[in-house]
Amino acid sequence: MPSSVTKHTIPPFYACYFLRSLSTPGTTYIGSTPAPPRRKRQHNGHLTQGAYKTSRARPWEMECIVYGFSSKIAALQFEWAWAKPHLSRHLKFLTTEHSVDGTPKNTSDWAGMSLFPSTSLTPGQTRWGRPKKRMARPPSSPNARLLAMRALLRSEPFCGWGLKLAFFTEWSWLAYQRLDACDPGLVAKSALSTLQNRYSRSGKPLHALYPVAVCDFSGVDGKREPLVHVSEPYRLDAGVAEHPVKKRQTSSRQKPHTEETSAWPETLPRSANLKGLDACMQDFATFPIPQPAAPNTDLTKKSKRAKKLSDKARPSALEDHDAENGVDDDDTEVEVVATDAANGSDLALSRPLYRMRFDDLNMEESEWKRFAESIAANVGASRSTTQAMSEFLHTCVQRHIAAQDARTANTALPAPTSLCSLCSIPIDLSQQLDFVLCPNPHASTLPLISSSSTASHETISECRETGCDSIFHLSCLARSFLEQQLGDQKATASSASTVLPTHGTCPCHRGEHKEPTMWADVVRAMYRRHERFERLIQFLIRSGRSLEQHLHPPLEVEMTVKGSKIKERVKASVKATEDAQVDIGDQRQVISGTTSRTKAALTRKRRQPTTSSVNAIQVDPLARNGSKIDGDGAGKDTKKNTTQKAKSNETSEVIDLT
């Protein structure tokens, strides 16, 4: 049986989600799915195949998700550890625990103990005379779920997967921000150059922005009203004040109103709501939002027509889509809610909030554009980007066709190659999984900072699409990233034995825009480029034309295509007209047939006496031939026979009675 490793690919989107019941806010649920909007509808009973455990506490709201997994198996591992933190081996005390800023702490006395021990047991009820087995239950409060998520993101191996966060409610985002503010050593995420590396629990250096988080307060399905777009009375009912509330100083003897959640150092207020966090509108002055969708330039996928929103439909919550996930309305992505002018608050201004997209379209488009520029620089420096890319793909198409036949496999064109920027060994550019491009971060994948004071958005870092034209072997770039991590002064022995890196910078990139990137994003971009390359090769083989002819078709071809489309439309209209005429003709025939039958019936009624007299005259010859006439039935038969015989007689045979 062939190995599945050769056909492995990273899914465009797969996430673990955190559900919270609206009817009983203390009830939570953890799951995983490639389509969060559809999964929420299943849990709420709008679609079939929802979880049995969520059928009672409906309706449910999705608080946040953790996405960016490399496979379904990886997502299931994270889901199990998140749902059962008291049993997970990843959430146990290490011999030495490191804080976020890398400060070590000796915890050898608690080594092997759970960070989130069970605080309750199942009730010991009896069933059919037998005692029910008491089992430890995991801490399942909303605060415990959020704290367990933060602990997992800093634990190995999950800390090296480049996972990302998306928050769909104000409470989950604000609670996460309050926990970050309590961590010593963390600085504001305003400029990437001033950030310091974060560290895992075992002391491994992480990316300064890890984990990257975005907010979509319109909900995972777009049916939720963000608090920044509602009036002041609604915000007060939700527990959000207009200005910060001064806390009363409590005595030292009084215990703080926080939930005791195991030995994990972070804590949250016991009441898991915005009022318990003392939320105010200043807390939501700025928050990260997703990037708008990039224009789709893939020739193998048909672009959908954009629908213009009317003024009445614009304030409403916009539906999100997922082509494979069965969600509707992908054409609209920006939610602009016009707030009431009588609010008088600067935070009540209209703020465009981009919807969360559950795909890798932005990364794919940015990576393909960088690939085209690298091909033009390394393979066809004297030609334009389109011409160089067209010739490169034409060579790959010819090689693919020649490889299908054993007789022409050896006579195929040579593969386009380029030297590795680190080892100077030629790289076969037709094998997309053998090399990577410049690992500088794609600006289209970084979050935007939504601010209430400015109408424009700024990225979470100031880097732009400034990737260089370097090409590396995958193994060469991995070694370069590992060397950069080992050069860190705070790197521990556990990070020295790491096989794969977590982040790094381009070794050949020069200039001010040299930014670190996550290794998971480098591998994900490589798979997105590989999948698009394979689709495009098959598309060009079927069409029989080059890439340049598809992008810039000749005038004759364009007129032919337009003419064929016009002919198809004319044929369709003519066919529709003919069908309509046939329907009208059928209706007329039905009406005329009904009218003729009615007239015939009336005519038969008027001519009935004449017919009876003729029949009476024709009876005698039949009687002479020996036919018996018995009763009414015999008379009817004679009437029929005489009528048919009278119709069949010619004019010469009719007896003139005059």
From Swiss-Prot:
Cofactor(s) required for function per UniProt: a divalent metal cation
Top-level enzyme category: hydrolase
Keywords tagged on the record: DNA damage, DNA recombination, DNA repair, Endonuclease, Hydrolase, Nuclease, Nucleus
Pfam family, one: GIY-YIG
Region (Disordered), start-end ranges: 29-52, 239-269, 288-328, 594-658
Molecular function as annotated in GO: 5'-flap endonuclease activity; crossover junction DNA endonuclease activity
EC annotation from Swiss-Prot or TrEMBL: 3.1.-.-
Domain GIY-YIG: 12-92
Annotated Gene Ontology cellular component terms: Slx1-Slx4 complex
Entry's localization field: Nucleus
Biased composition (Basic and acidic residues): 308-324, 627-640
Compositional bias of kind Polar residues: 641-652
DNA damage keyword on record: yes
GO BP, sorted A to Z: double-strand break repair via homologous recombination
Similarity field: Belongs to the SLX1 family.
SUBUNIT field: Forms a heterodimer with SLX4.
Its biological purpose: Catalytic subunit of the SLX1-SLX4 structure-specific endonuclease that resolves DNA secondary structures generated during DNA repair and recombination. Has endonuclease activity towards branched DNA substrates, introducing single-strand cuts in duplex DNA close to junctions with ss-DNA.
Name used for this protein in its record: Structure-specific endonuclease subunit SLX1
Organism: Mycosarcoma maydis
